[in-house]
């Protein structure tokens, strides 16, 4: 009975509040987005730079408390000054353990539902952790898809927490270096780890496909895609293929938006996709910042469609 009660509590923590409800989120100014759309955003998407906050007491805790009620933190390998701070191989070998543990412990102190979204759009050449350059050339073994998968598994285990002995045993089982930090990491049953590629790679090569970076079902809680309407075209087929390729996983749209155009048909189609695919648990609009090319404030037709078709999905 105690075990069943524990499982029931976890379901309340990690799933939308009502049957069929979807968590709606936004990047940028939540208050402005609510004024624009009427949406009471549950999720706030935030972006981090590698190791930012390690030398600033309270900063990492504020990433959670200031991006509630449900923060979605995107972890990047870019340093705050723009250069690459660590490679996927470096993460896989444990050289990022101190930073990752700080985030995990902050999530535990936060104590409520949160998403961790490590190394998103990994099959996009603009990210340091992609295995390929825009011309299709290989970036080398430190950035290989294999090392990415290993890095993601390590991140997952740290974010979920556990005793040092248990985590090290799990790392050993997959041939990885033990933790480079001392002590246990508090467990985080309320944290959902999101694996978020693009539906197809850029460069669009078989070896740079989304699933080339997939770490395995046991290291992913939610599969997600980023989907933008660019020149009145969005990659819906790739989105559906990604959705179908992981039938046991909940799904999210980690970022979606209109790239400098006013296209209400895209908004309506997003609503249709969500309604017709019950595994979708969250969609996050990018972004609410005034004057940004994605700002719904400059897109009256799409804004009206958002109010009519998207906002009710969160009810």
Predicted region positions:
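Substrate-binding cleft of extracellular glycoside hydrolase catalytic domains
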Residues: 58-179, 188-190, 279, 283-286, ...
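Glycoside hydrolase catalytic-domain groove-lining segments
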Residues: 56-76, 213-263
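Bacterial N-terminal signal peptides
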Residues: 7-16
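Hydrophobic faces of well-ordered beta-strands that scaffold small-molecule active sites
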Residues: 24-26, 42-46, 69-75, 114-118, ...
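Boundary/entry segment of secreted carbohydrate-active catalytic domains
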Residues: 19-55
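Alpha-helical scaffolding within the catalytic cores
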Residues: 26-34, 53-63, 98-103, 178-181, ...
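Solvent-exposed loop/turn segments at secondary-structure junctions
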Residues: 49-52, 77-81, 121-125, 198-203, ...
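Substrate-binding cleft of secreted/luminal carbohydrate-active enzymes
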Residues: 22-27, 114, 250-315
């Amino acid at each position: 009975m105690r075990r069943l009660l524990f499982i029931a509590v976890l379901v309340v923590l990690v799933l939308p509040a009502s049957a069929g409800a979807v968590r709606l989120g936004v990047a940028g100014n939540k208050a402005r987005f609510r004024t624009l759309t009427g949406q009471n955003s549950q999720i706030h998407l935030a972006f981090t730079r590698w190791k930012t906050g390690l030398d600033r007491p309270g900063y990492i805790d504020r990433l959670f408390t200031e991006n509630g009620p449900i923060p979605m933190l995107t972890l990047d390998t870019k340093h705050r000054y723009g250069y690459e701070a660590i490679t996927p191989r470096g993460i896989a070998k444990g050289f990022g353990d101190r930073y990752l543990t700080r985030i995990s412990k902050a999530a535990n102190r936060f104590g409520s539902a949160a998403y961790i979204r490590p190394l998103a759009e990994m099959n996009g050449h603009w990210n340091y952790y992609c295995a390929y350059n825009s011309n299709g050339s290989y970036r080398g073994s430190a950035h290989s898809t294999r090392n990415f998968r290993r890095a993601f598994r390590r991140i997952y285990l740290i974010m979920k927490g556990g005793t040092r002995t248990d985590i090290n045993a799990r790392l050993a089982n997959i041939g990885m270096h033990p933790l480079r930090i001392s002590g246990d990491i508090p467990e985080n049953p309320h944290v959902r780890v999101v694996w978020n590629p693009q539906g197809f790679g850029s460069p669009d090569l078989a070896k740079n496909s989304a699933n080339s970076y997939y770490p395995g079902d046991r290291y992913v809680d939610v599969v997600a895609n980023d989907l933008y309407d660019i020149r009145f075209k969005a990659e819906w087929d790739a989105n559906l293929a990604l959705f179908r390729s992981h039938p046991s996983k909940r799904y999210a749209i980690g970022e979606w938006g209109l790239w400098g155009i006013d296209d209400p048909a895209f908004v309506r189609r997003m609503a249709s996709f969500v309604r017709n695919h019950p595994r979708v648990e969250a969609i996050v609009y990018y972004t609410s910042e005034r004057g940004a090319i994605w700002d719904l404030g400059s897109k009256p037709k799409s804004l009206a469609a958002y109010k009519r078709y998207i906002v009710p999905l969160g009810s």
